[in-house]
Amino acid sequence: MRWRAGVAVCLKNWQTVIHLGTARVYDTGMNPKIVDAVNKQIRLEFESAFLYLAFSGNLRQYGLPGMGHWMREQYREECGHALRFVTHLENRRAQVVIPSVAAPVYTWETPLDLFRLSLEHERRITASIHDLLTLCREEREYATQCLLFDYVKEQVEEELQVEEIVDIMTLCGSRIDELLGLDQKLASRTTQAWE
């Protein structure tokens, strides 16, 4: 019994080392280019999450709690995306590097500006997912390709959702009653689990 408990402690310590990104415990044969690219995508997903969290606070301060809630749900979704990539690397016994994330830098004057920034950001994430998928095809990394197909579909939906909000806000113009109606509608958003 003691031996088994000792092994469990060792395995737990090995997992800790993997999570901290300080050593590689297993050589799984996963292409290092792919591992690096997935770790970069993890960083981008966490950067996205913190951008949306910042936008959420801005919108709540502006007096639009429904839009703030929508952005907070987007934050949760982006964290889920990052964690799914982490799980993929863990399942492949590849090294996971958890990044530090800098505070987002942006300027805005109106809530519409924040949603336009969101749309630009989602388009950058889409391009990054496409680049990662292209690399996986070139390197014949089929397991990661399968994972990425979900993200390709998700990005189409995310861009469309933000485009529709931008369109509605543009049509609202300076009509505060319309903006408040949209705010109320966005308050009902819930996040799908991605892990």
How does the language model describe each region?
Residues R2-W3, A8-E195:
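Iron-associated oxidoreductase/ferritin-like identity signal
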